[in-house]
């Protein structure tokens, strides 16, 4: 009996020290988007640190895609990844030959999830598939669990390379021996 009272007292003290847990979610999505940064680095001539505001000022692309996980059509808007790589000085178009063809891109999420694309897969002079860094879905900023940035590759049968909470893009030149 005394043990139960001590336990209740400890819980009460913990609540007073930490404060009651709120059932109302904090407005994280809005502040996360305004302070979030997307880093583009590695084998680039101009490393970039881009904010949501920076992306809004760039040429925009809208893609209507069927999300296989959700089994519904979603409309994403953002910037072509090819455009961001161009801005960072990554070889594209006619310069995509020789060593540039062994270059790959690693996209990483906040939780450490990583995916790889060959640079050629992202060059619209070579392929017809567009990959975007989205910041809105269905006309609204991405939800906290999705954004503030999300890589969307609609041409893929499985969305395994649709990176949620995208934080960085690293360009790597493969060493061929």
Language-model region placement:
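Bacterial N-terminal signal peptides
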Residues: 8-22
């Amino acid at each position: 009996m005394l043990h139960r009272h001590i336990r209740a007292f400890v819980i009460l003290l913990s609540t007073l020290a930490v404060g009651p847990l709120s059932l109302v979610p904090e407005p994280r999505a809005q502040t996360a988007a305004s302070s979030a940064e997307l880093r583009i680095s590695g084998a680039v001539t101009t490393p970039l640190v881009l904010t949501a505001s920076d992306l809004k000022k760039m040429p925009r692309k809208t893609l209507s895609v069927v999300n296989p996980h959700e089994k519904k059509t979603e409309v994403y808007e953002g910037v072509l990844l090819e455009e961001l790589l161009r801005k960072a000085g990554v070889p594209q178009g006619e310069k995509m030959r020789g060593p540039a063809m062994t270059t790959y891109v690693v996209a990483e999420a906040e939780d450490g999830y990583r995916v790889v694309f060959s640079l050629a897969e992202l060059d619209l002079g070579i392929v017809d598939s567009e990959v975007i860094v989205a910041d809105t879905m269905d006309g609204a900023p991405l939800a906290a669990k999705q954004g503030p940035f999300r890589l969307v590759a609609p041409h893929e049968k499985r969305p395994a390379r649709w990176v949620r909470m995208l934080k960085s893009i690293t360009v790597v030149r493969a060493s061929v021996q």
